[in-house]
Amino acid sequence: MVAICIKIGERERKRVHIMLLAYTWKTRVSSHQCNKSPIFGLFAIQFSNICSNLLLLQQKLSMGLSRYLSRRHHWVIQYCGLLLFLYLIYSYVATSNDGPNLHEDIPVFQGQGKDRANPNPPAALGDEALDPFEKYRGHEKIKWEDEAAYEKEKRREGPGEWGKPVKLPEDKEVEKEALSLYKANGYNAYISDMISLNRSIKDIRHKECKNMMYSAKLPTVSVIFPFHEEHNSTLLRSVYSVINRSPPELLKEIILVDDFSEKPALRQPLEDFLKKNKIDHIVKVLRTKKREGLIRGRQLGAQDATGEILIFLDAHSEANYNWLPPLLDPIAEDYRTVVCPFVDVIDCETYEVRPQDEGARGSFDWAFNYKRLPLTKKDRESPTKPFNSPVMAGGYFAISAKWFWELGGYDEGLDIWGGEQYELSFKVWQCHGRMVDAPCSRVAHIYRCKYAPFKNAGMGDFVSRNYKRVAEVWMDDYKETLYKHRPGVGNADAGDLKLMKGIREKLQCKSFDWFMKEIAFDQDKYYPAVEPKASAEGEIRNVGTNFCIDTQFKEQNQRFGLRKCTSDDKDGGGEQDLRLTRWHDIRPKGRKICFDCSTSVDKAPVILFDCHSMKGNQLFKYRVAQKQIYHPISGQCLTADENGKGFLHMKKCDSSSDLQKWAWQTVDNELLETRQANEAKEQE
């Protein structure tokens, strides 16, 4: 220190530099706008003022000491004092951090709008900056139901009103045009064009939802619809459903993110429509310059959003009545809560709106297929109360902008689609947040069918790469189980994971073992890492025809029947090695596609459908004594066609009918009896 001071003292001619130090630093900090750290910026400006005042004080002191010390010694003392002061300030800044800086060296994706809600406000601004939702607590609870809107919609008439199904006119030209639109969209877009953009839908909420009370003051929302080549009327109906069924004081904006669509109707005509119908003040369109994919499309919409809460929806949706307050109220109570609505069904053929079910918890199997877990007994007792869900379905959820950006938004290393729902779900739970489903918030969704309308993204196996990124960052040692069940994932190149691992470290997130034991605590019961032994397996021979059930490697929604048993005809081929699993469903060996019957009519069809391990339509019981395969939901028994050539169906049980008698190749009677007894207890 002394040596430096003497050296500086020898350079008296440059003493003006030190006097300019404070001014220069202050100017640079101000012009930079303290982007990296608002707190540091405020501190820097104050520090520069202190430096300036210190120099003025030094000048006064030097004037008072001039009669005792030489001019050279004056400057030596001043320089040494200033260096000592700088050293003390540096020591204070370097050691005064009481906790992890959650945003250091981690880019935060914020939009540049002047009205933007700052997702990471400086702690120095007070409690409201740390928790901006404090102002929404403590208010009276009110009913947000818009009775006038209900009455108005009740008077509507026309195709598809009240969510009723619509049929195509019987006309060859219409059928031809409808088929063309079907192939282009994956749903019946011709029917969509027949239905009003403002159509009414059936209120399919639980009856008690109409009596629910929510905070009288709730945060504002930005609703984000990413889309690519969406059919125009379906997209606009999604928009109008949100506008018509949302309190105007809560709906700040709707953002349509056009992911490089080429359809002419989605270009300038879309913006002209918004302007002509005077909704361009609330609906704005963002357009990408290249194909970004669903994940980055959502991220871009979030960056541009100005609402306090971000709501992500698919662009082929219709919001139900009073859908918004149930999503917002839990977030107002705790901004780290993510809320998902119940997702109902818009039929891809007829546009009928119908409920999917009355709730289930989201989960996954070890090949990373999205699955559902049954509600706990406690959750079933409160049909209107939000309940914890380990994993979101992906396309429908509400999250505070503050929490979304604290989590780093979506991992921008994920391409197109796939894995984003696991990535966000895991980090919400593991990083000290919570995720719930809100039964009184319902949004209907079109599940595309028959045709895959979009071009290949040309990015190789992006889904495996996405899964690898999620596994490497969040799943710890459990990732090996995923790699075992989905081998392509383990060999994929995950890319640079430094940023996402840095977020996990700085947020001090919990382990995946904690997630599996505390949040997805019963997943192993329904989707175990090791497949449990089957109760019965092998061929299922029909006594009346002496033929065996053959699923013939068919896919979802396809029917099947009987063929000559492969044990009788070694060259016959087919798919006859079946399993009666611990979940009481019947599936071909090595495949997760199950026997399914959804109706109780006479001769109800039996189809193949993705296994969900939740019983219901896929629950079958083998009655050993009668050799019947009983379906409790329909109350009927599996029946073969008389000549053995038709499809299998369900029919009223008749113990005397050989067409309803089935002989499994191998049956573990003790295991079967135990499992069926346990299943009966669960139903009590």
Curated annotation (Swiss-Prot):
Residues 96-684 are lumenal. Disulfide bonds join 209-440, 431-509, 548-565, 594-611, 637-653. The chain crosses the membrane at residues 75-95. Glycans are attached at residues 198, 232. Residues 581-684 form the Ricin B-type lectin domain. Substrate binds at residues 259, 291, 417, 448. Its cofactor is Mn(2+). One of its GO terms (molecular function) is carbohydrate binding. PROSITE patterns: RICIN_B_LECTIN. Its EC number is 2.4.1.41. It is found in: Golgi apparatus membrane. Keywords: Disulfide bond, Glycoprotein, Glycosyltransferase, Golgi apparatus, Lectin, Manganese, Membrane, Metal-binding, Signal-anchor, Transferase, Transmembrane, Transmembrane helix. Pfam families: Glycos_transf_2, Ricin_B_lectin. Residues 386-448 are annotated as: Catalytic subdomain B. Pathway: Protein modification; protein glycosylation. GO terms for cellular component: Golgi apparatus; Golgi membrane. PANTHER family: N-ACETYLGALACTOSAMINYLTRANSFERASE, N-ACETYLGALACTOSAMINYLTRANSFERASE 4-RELATED. May catalyze the initial reaction in O-linked oligosaccharide biosynthesis, the transfer of an N-acetyl-D-galactosamine residue to a serine or threonine residue on the protein receptor. Belongs to the glycosyltransferase 2 family. GalNAc-T subfamily. This is Putative polypeptide N-acetylgalactosaminyltransferase 10. It comes from Caenorhabditis elegans.
